[in-house]
Amino acid sequence: MGYLFEETLSSNPKTPIVVDDDNELGLMAVRLANAAAFPMVLKASLELGVFDTLYAEASRTDSFLSPSEIASKLPTTPRNPGAPVLLDRMLRLLASYSMVKCEKVSVGKEQRVYRAEPICRFFLKNNIQDIGSLASQVIVNFDSVFLNTWAQLKDVVLEGGDAFGRAHGGMKLFDYMGTDERFSKLFNQTGFTIAVVKKALEVYQGFKGVNVLVDVGGGVGNTLGVVTSKYPNIKGINFDLTCALAQAPTYPGVEHVAGDMFVDVPTGNAMILKRILHDWTDEDCVKILKNCWKSLPQNGKVVVIELVTPDEAENGDINANIAFDMDMLMFTQCSGGKERSRAEFEALAAASGFSHCQFVCQAYHCWIIEFCK
C-alpha cells in the first residue's frame, strides 16, 4: 500500500509523490526508456570541451562557472546566442548523474552555476598522457560508424551474421578502418587503457628482468611508451598492421614493426596482448596465442590485459554492468568478439600450449593475466 504524504499531487516538482513498489518500478522504467539522452549529451559535452573548461577552472580557482562563462571559454566560441541556455540544460542533466556539481546563485536574478566533479578527470581530452582519457572512447562508441551497427542487432539475433558487416557492406571492423582514415584515427586515439597500464604498474612486478617486450597489436605504441618509461632497460617492439602504425609517434626504446599477428610475431622474452583477445573468436585467439608461444623462450610469458566477466549477472554490481556492456559492444563491433570468464581464459591458455595462466592483479575494469610457457 502507498502512502500519500500531501493531500494531492500537483505540478509542483517539490510535492512528494505516492511511494510504493509500483511507482518505483515505473520511475525506473521511464528512466531506462529515456536513457539515450545521457550518453548523447555526454558525447556532445566532450566534443565541445565542456569538461576540460570546467576542470581547468576548478584546478585554478575551485570556482563555479555560469553557462554564459562556460560558453565564452569553450575552445570554439559558439555563434549561437542561445548557447548558454542549451548548455545549462545539458549541464543540469550531467549534474543529475554527479558528473558536475550544480548550485544556484543570485546575481540580479537566480541562475545555476557549475563546477567539475572529480570524475571529470577521466574524461579530459588533454589528459591522455597523464591517466588516460575516456573522452575518445565515448566519442568513438557513439560515432555513426558504430551507431549504425546497433540497428542490426535484432536482425543478427533472428537471422545470424555480423552486425558490423551488415552495416558496412560486409566488411570487418579492422578491414573497414583501412578504408576510413577519419574513423581509424578516432579509434586509435581511445586512450583509457593507458590508465589501466599505469594503474597496473603500481603493483604489477612482472616486467622486471624482461629484456625484449613485444606488444602484439600495440596500435600507436603508447602502452610500450608507458612501460619503457618505468623500465628503460627494456627494448620494446610495437607490432601491428601498417595502417595502425601510420599514426604512431616515436617513443624512447621502442621500435615499430609492421606485420600480421595471424602470420607470425617478433621474438621477445615477454609479450603483451592488451585488449586484443576480446576482438576475436576462440579459434582466432588460439592462432594468435600459438604464434606468441612460438616466439617466446622457455619460461617466457604473455601478459594479457583483459576484462574478466563475472560468473553471475548480479543486480547493482558495477563490475557486472561494465563487463556485460562491453560484451555487447564486442557483439556489435567485432564478428565473434566477446568478453571472457576466468574459465574461458584458462581454456585458451591450454589450447594454445601454455602450461598455465594466472590472474595477477586488477586495474580498474581489467585484469593482468599471465599466460606462462
Curated annotation (Swiss-Prot):
Gene Ontology terms: biological process? callus formation; methylation
According to its UniProt record, which protein family does this protein belong to?
A: Belongs to the class I-like SAM-binding methyltransferase superfamily. Cation-independent O-methyltransferase family.
- Which pathway or pathways does this protein act in? Secondary metabolite biosynthesis
Q: Which residues bind S-adenosyl-L-homocysteine?
A: 217, 240, 260-261, 274
Keyword Endoplasmic reticulum annotated: no
Q: Active-site residues?
A: 278
- What is its biological role? Involved in indole glucosinolate biosynthesis. Catalyzes methoxylation reactions of the glucosinolate indole ring. Converts the hydroxy intermediates 4-hydroxy-indol-3-yl-methylglucosinolate (4OH-I3M) and 1-hydroxy-indol-3-yl-methylglucosinolate (1OH-I3M) to 4-methoxy-indol-3-yl-methylglucosinolate (4MO-I3M) and 1-methoxy-indol-3-yl-methylglucosinolate(1MO-I3M), respectively.
* UniProt enzyme class: transferase
Q: What is its EC number?
A: 2.1.1.-
Tell me which Pfam families the record gives: Dimerisation (PF08100), Methyltransf_2 (PF00891)
Look up and give the organism this protein is from.
Answer: Arabidopsis thaliana
Q: Which protein, by its recorded name, is this?
A: Indole glucosinolate O-methyltransferase 3
